[in-house]
């Protein structure tokens, strides 16, 4: 399996002219991802919100078209009604070594009981447009509801 994968990458499967080596992006993690909740807790069974601050750094030598997907559990939402559970933030092209910070507001409501909720983050490196994916980095973070 390893012998077949290397020649395909060297052919530049993702490049229009077939000359670009993308093995570094495919094999290694292209991003450094860190998160902070502001404030760090949310109140149970009350309408309220907090902001998920996401810092994303491109650690490759090339610019990457980047987006972040945030997925919430059932009792939280991205709007006051709590209906939206997934959001994609299109960051655009990040240069080599560039760092960007994105804030996403998360709402709790009357159905959010106390406990710890897991939020999934996925940072995606795209090629050409947002429909083609080269690599992705996933991270879980938890929000405490008291």
Q: Where would I find each of the regions flagged by the language model?
A:
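Short proline/glycine- and polar residue-rich coil/turn motifs
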Residues: 90-100
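Low-complexity, acidic Ser/Thr/Pro/Gly-rich terminal tails and inter-domain linkers that flank the onset
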Residues: 11-45, 146
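Terminal connector regions
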Residues: 108-146
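Exposed aromatic-hydrophobic patches
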Residues: 101-106
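Hydrophobic core residues within well-ordered beta-strands of beta-rich domains
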Residues: 50-52, 100, 117-119
